Amino acid sequence: METTVVGKGLPKVDAWAKVKGNIIYADDFTLPGMLYAKVLRSKYPAARILAIDTSKALALPGVHAVLTAKDVPNNNLKAKFGQSTDIGAQFEGLYRVLAEGKVRFLGEPVALVAAESLRLAEKALELIEVEYEPLPGVFDPLEALKPGAYPVGENESNVVSRFKIRKGDVEAGFAAADVIVENTYRVPFVDHAYLEPESGVAWLDEDGVINIRVSTQVIEHFRTVAEVLGLPQNKVRVIGTWLGGGFGGKEDITVESFLALLTWKTGRPVKLTYTREESLLAHSKRHPYI
């Protein structure tokens, strides 16, 4: 019996375009009249935000928008995380677009800027004045579980979800074992380390739809973006680009909400690309375990 696929060489249809450098990745895409965005991030892992003054940044010629949490129609969304399995179900968490009241982690987004050039956007970030009150924070998961531990989120407890895994008769297994080894094992978080940092361009089309051309593994984030802006879902369109690496790290929402907010505010196309350092700081990681 002759097979048609197994054992046959199949050409990789995009190989030549990639080796020749002809692929258009997210950051390669530009539009006329495009603005450039930057994100102001918290320099503290835990702090109260006492005041934010954006007046100097807004007064800088060439700056078209400076946004904080008060400018986001729906800044706090409840989101489902995880997958329903036989050992545990999805749990509900908070997706906060921009820090509000306090910051919960180093690098949490505090403000957004859109300007005529990348240099102007960076200068505008320097002019935003944020008054912080540093808080003690908590930096070890076992310490975070103790009664009275500093609450990272809005709840008094740092336990997001709890479930037990039971399989077989452990006591019988121990009784029959020749050797029992007990230890505590820690696995650190792992960065996905893709070559292409997070990037995208957003624009408004003639029908008033916000289009977001973004490096992502999940285009369904248009639903979240629509909720952030308080728009019907058919008013947001997410277009996935050629991906310069993902490995699961671009499954979570990254620049989409920021781009949509700035385009919605200015009416202009907006590009946002993270630096390598910003990508390492800001994007989701593979979870650590104990």
Can you name each region flagged by the protein language model?
Residues 1-158, 180-183, 265:
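Flexible, low-hydrophobicity surface segments
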Residues 72, 216-219, 242-246, 274-283:
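Acidic, glycine-rich active-site loops and adjacent beta-strand->loop/helix elements
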